[in-house]
Swiss-Prot record:
It comes from Dianthus caryophyllus (Carnation). The lineage of its organism: Eukaryota, Viridiplantae, Streptophyta, Embryophyta, Tracheophyta. Pathway: Alkene biosynthesis; ethylene biosynthesis via S-adenosyl-L-methionine; ethylene from S-adenosyl-L-methionine: step 2/2. Its EC number is 1.14.17.4. This is Probable 1-aminocyclopropane-1-carboxylate oxidase. InterPro entries: DIOX_N (IPR026992), IPNS-like_FE2OG_OXY (IPR044861), IPNS-like_sf (IPR027443), Oxoglu/Fe-dep_dioxygenase_dom (IPR005123), Plant_2OG-oxidoreductases (IPR050295). It is an enzyme of class 1 (oxidoreductase).
Amino acid sequence: MANIVNFPIIDMEKLNNYNGVERSLVLDQIKDACHNWGFFQVVNHSLSHELMDKVERMTKEHYKKFREQKFKDMVQTKGLVSAESQVNDIDWESTFYLRHRPTSNISEVPDLDDQYRKLMKEFAAQIERLSEQLLDLLCENLGLEKAYLKNAFYGANGPTFGTKVSNYPPCPKPDLIKGLRAHTDAGGIILLFQDDKVSGLQLLKDGHWVDVPPMKHSIVVNLGDQLEVITNGKYKSVMHRVIAQTDGNRMSIASFYNPGSDAVIYPAPTLVEKEEEKCRAYPKFVFEDYMNLYLKLKFQEKEPRFEAMKAMETTGPIPTA
């Protein structure tokens, strides 16, 4: 059972308090969450409850209509229902991906009706705006100029932005199969709209797995590996996983605001200068090179990935535009 602790909850509405006191307190809460958790949950954000309710309803309807039977067929074919030992090479999840930037694939994804496509485009646009707002709040806390992180993510065609739509159906053997194995996220900032009734998401904090509590109309935010690099380790990406449940079908809609594939990622010079050693603790690399490595090593510790990128850097320096 996961440790029960006070998970950080950020009230975005208080950022609009122009006397500055509440705003300063909220910025401190975000800073503490980034330093000590790598995760936080935002409420009273810019997405309407009406939009979120509609996205949840249509996503669950879509799963029942188009994906549920395919998932049942898959687990039978893979022999997961009859597994007798730990399963380490597959996850108990049904997923599809929507790409928004640099180009959208929503019109090409099969089995989406027009109303759902239109809805997910609207949802993605609002999540993208919230992602950029949060990145600017991180800049403010770090002493970076506004839009520094957004600009750092921009390649020739802007950032990479997409959404992973997942369902985690009831699992007969949650002790043997994970909903999603432990990993850190490769990219920038991740915004998750998760089920408010069925739990399962956990993060690793101080050596213990901690539940991320379901909360209606909230958005869970976590930091990816690229923010760890750009902040020179001030903020860390954190291992997290999904525990399969025997009851309930958990919905998860995770949107990833990542660097463009050709974006060059490296620690922000002003943050390096603030360090006592004035030392760059992370390498400089092209995001696509990191992703190619990550796809092979996703469910392993992140440190060897950073070391591998350091080795690549020494063999060929990357010019900075």
